[in-house]
Curated annotation (Swiss-Prot):
It is found in: Mitochondrion inner membrane. Gene3D superfamilies: ATP synthase, F0 complex, subunit A (1.20.120.220). This is ATP synthase F(0) complex subunit a. Pfam families: ATP-synt_A (PF00119).
């Protein structure tokens, strides 16, 4: 039976047991543990420098109250980057191509930012639903539109991450299939196609990191509006 291109996004199972939990937990095993030595090795030093740079850029527009989220957002970005990068390896499963996982990350974090705004600044949070200077007849319509746009935010977060990764994986598989089909018939064309595949893989590595950064950056912008 011919396999579908979308079979790579199905959650693998062994003896009927879904392995998505192991796929999600595995990246944490790859993280280097802090060293007890006075001078850390190069890997930990580079990792710490990158996380500090990212945290400083992310927390720059936030006030002191938003700095409490620095560890959570930095950990989330590293986690997403690791999962996305591991998903580019052959014969691996990418959990972030599942909308259920991405929505499970987006909805609680978005809801937490909204609750913080309603608890700390209820007047300002509710005032964002109605722009200043709105004509009286348009007030009900604008409130409905702003409320809908507010609730669409977590959906946009999850769908953006899922769609970008899914499209990239499908394109890589299509071009890789073309390489195997063309290799015995037209080797020259197959080599050119393989070059395109290599360049596309490099692009997907960049997309995997950029999408994780965009996911966390949008969360920080939502947090900025509510702290």
């Amino acid at each position: 039976m011919a396999m579908s291109f979308f079979d790579q996004f199905a959650s693998p199972s062994y003896l009927g047991i879904p392995l998505i939990a192991i796929a999600i937990a595995l990246p944490w095993v790859l993280f280097p543990l802090p060293s007890l030595r006075w001078v850390n090795n190069r890997l930990i030093t580079i990792q710490g420098w990158l996380i500090n740079r990212f945290t400083n850029q992310l927390m720059l527009p936030l006030n002191t109250g938003g700095h409490k989220w620095a560890l959570l957002l930095a950990s989330l970005m590293v986690f997403l980057i690791t999962i996305n990068m591991l998903g580019l390896l052959p014969y691996t499963f990418t959990p972030t191509t599942q909308l259920s996982l991405n929505m499970g990350l987006a909805i609680p974090l978005w809801l937490a930012t909204v609750i913080i705004g309603l608890r700390n600044q209820p007047t300002v949070a509710l005032g964002d639903l109605l722009p200043e200077g709105t004509p009286l007849p348009l007030i009900p319509v604008l409130i409905i539109i702003e409320t809908i746009s507010l609730f669409i935010r977590p959906l946009a977060l999850g769908v953006r991450l899922t769609a970008n990764l899914t499209a990239g994986h499908l394109l890589i598989q299509l071009i890789a299939t073309a390489v195997f089909v063309l290799l015995p018939m037209m080797p020259t064309v197959a080599i050119l196609t393989a070059t395109v595949l290599f360049l596309l893989t490099l692009l997907e590595v960049a997309v995997a990191m950029i999408q994780a950064y965009v996911f966390v950056l949008l969360l920080s912008l939502y947090l900025q509006e509510n702290v």
